[in-house]
């Protein structure tokens, strides 16, 4: 196994260990750490990327778990999944709000459309099924980010700032219900995190 390290930051999501398993299945070493781990300790591991997990909270609530904002200045690529995606948006100047049935609340298998010019979706189909489970959505994405995936109900299923290496997806690529999810994770590891065999 490749001993370059990916750190999965745990924000309380139910699929955290599954994310780690998918990373390892792609041949990259991975450790799951609580979001409260001091940034200096995380950076001492010399990660080639961070993956922020999902979680049951809303980023705009006062007691919601957050990451040290200095992480975004560390020069390390970040992939946010569900809550992790919203966390990226929230910290970098976007706006996350509660969804309702008319504004992008999604649960279950969802037909999703991708911009395959984004490194995260390189070599993948422009349309596939993903597994959604979110009650919040990004009403406004941060400056410098592009919208790179959407569904019929949600205009911003995925965002990216390729210059800084920040990527976020509202869906769960780690679960089997998401077609090509493991391929997307592999792209993060090898195309963005620059892991090598």
Give the positions of each predicted feature:
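Cysteine-nucleophile active-site neighborhood
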Residues: 21-27, 44-123, 129, 179-186
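Conserved small/polar residues in nucleotide/adenosyl-binding loops
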Residues: 195-197
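Catalytic beta-strand/loop cores that center a nucleophilic Ser/Cys/Thr
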Residues: 116-163
């Amino acid at each position: 196994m490749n001993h370059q390290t990916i750190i999965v930051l745990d924000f309380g999501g139910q699929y955290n260990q599954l994310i780690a398993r998918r990373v390892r299945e792609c041949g990259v070493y991975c450790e799951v750490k609580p979001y409260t781990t001091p940034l200096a300790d995380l950076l001492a591991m010399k990660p080639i990327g961070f993956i922020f997990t999902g979680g049951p909270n809303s980023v705009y609530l006062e007691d919601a778990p957050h990451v040290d904002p200095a992480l975004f200045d560390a020069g390390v690529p970040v992939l946010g999944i569900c809550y992790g995606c919203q966390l990226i948006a929230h910290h970098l100047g976007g706006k996350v709000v509660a969804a309702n049935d008319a504004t992008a609340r999604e649960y279950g298998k969802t037909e999703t459309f991708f911009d395959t010019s984004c490194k995260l979706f390189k070599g993948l189909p422009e349309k596939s099924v993903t597994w959604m489970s979110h009650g919040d959505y990004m009403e406004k994405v941060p400056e410098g980010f592009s919208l790179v995936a959407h569904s019929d109900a949600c205009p911003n299923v995925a965002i990216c700032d390729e210059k800084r290496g920040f990527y976020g997806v509202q869906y769960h690529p780690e679960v089997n219900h998401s077609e090509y999810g493991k391929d997307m994770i592999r792209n993060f590891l090898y195309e963005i995190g620059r892991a090598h065999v």
